[in-house]
Design a protein with these regions (language model features):
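Short acidic donor-binding/metal-coordinating loop in glycosyltransferase active sites
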Residues: 1, 9-11, 97
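Conserved nucleotide-sugar donor-binding
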Residues: 1, 75-89
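Acidic donor-binding/catalytic loop of UDP-sugar-dependent glycosyltransferases
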Residues: 8-24
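Short aromatic/hydrophobic "clamp" motif used to bind/position activated sugar donors
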Residues: 4
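Loop-to-transmembrane-helix entry motif
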Residues: 68, 142, 172-176
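Catalytic donor/gating beta->alpha subdomain of glycosyltransferases that bind UDP-sugars
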Residues: 25-59, 93-94, 102-167, 233, ...
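Membrane-embedded multi-pass helical conduit in multi-pass membrane proteins
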Residues: 171-253
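Membrane-proximal intrinsically disordered regions of secretory-pathway and membrane-system proteins
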Residues: 256-263
Length: 263
């Protein structure tokens, strides 16, 4: 078959989803078309709202990358259609085959799009712990792909390099940037202990690390503050990305993973 649809088993698609995916392939230059994910919040006691917000913004970025550059950087693995000629053998122990195939489409100078009218529905992860494990696995898979496709930053034209760097690589660098900022703030304060500015920076850095603990305490008291929960979600996902990087450095031994428990 010329077009293959990849879909997760836990996905429910809107009735016209396949038609919306297929219509973009009238353009022979299109190699992949991805759907967007919609979630409903059944239980907002943990990080469901924050994950829903993240997925919504991520979908908007992917849609506009396709419209502006013809280069959606990484289709949602939940549901996408791809020309069969771009489906290649996935390397052993690879964790993010959807991202691998998406970048392969761009490497072949084909267009990668996201159609906002192709909609699928998926339940949100049940807890922060579940999403943490998933993001850690995704992070390790992202670095696997980066090792293979980093050349896209300079060997292809800017339509691929710009969104790849600004959307993905900058995000993957964020744990290291945060860690560097913390270390530098400590060093600067040690060098200039009387500096008001360095004291302020250090206090702000310390507050960023303490706020997630405040959210944990408030949650146990059945108090939910959305901004605090969002901040805890942000810090937790960056820790997960860093640990995923460590997993990649150590070497991924298997691509078998336990499905995420969802609401």
């Amino acid at each position: 078959y010329d077009i293959v649809v990849m879909m997760d088993a836990n996905i429910i698609s809107k009735e016209n989803c396949l038609i919306e995916l297929a219509k973009y392939f009238k353009n022979e230059d299109v190699g992949l078309v991805a759907a967007v994910i919609e979630n409903s919040v059944k239980d907002d006691t943990d990080i469901a709202k924050q994950e829903q917000y993240y997925i919504k913004k991520e979908s908007q970025i992917k849609v506009h990358e396709g419209l502006l550059f013809g280069a959606t950087i990484g289709a949602f693995g939940a549901c996408y259609a791809i020309r069969s000629k771009y489906v290649k053998t996935i390397p052993s122990n690879f964790l993010m085959e959807d991202f691998y195939l998406s970048l392969n489409v761009l490497e072949e100078d084909a267009i990668c799009m996201t159609n906002p009218e192709a909609i699928v529905y998926e339940d949100l992860p049940g807890t922060l712990q579940e999403e943490f494990k998933r993001k850690r696995r995704i992070s390790a898979g992202n670095f696997q792909n980066l090792k293979i496709y980093i050349h896209l930053l300079w060997t292809k034209n800017w339509r691929v390099g710009l969104p790849f760097f600004s959307h993905k690589i900058l995000r993957w660098m964020s744990p290291f940037l945060i860690l560097t900022a913390i270390i530098l703030s400590c060093l600067l304060l040690a060098m200039e202990p009387n500096s008001f500015f360095y004291r302020l920076v250090f206090i702000l850095m310390l507050a960023n690390l303490i706020l997630p603990l405040v959210d944990i305490v408030l949650k146990r008291m059945n108090i939910s503050v959305n901004l605090l929960r969002l901040h805890r979600y942000f810090i937790s996902m960056n820790i997960a990305m860093f640990l995923g990087f460590i997993d990649w450095i150590r070497g991924v031994k298997t691509n078998i993973w336990k499905p995420t428990e969802r609401l």
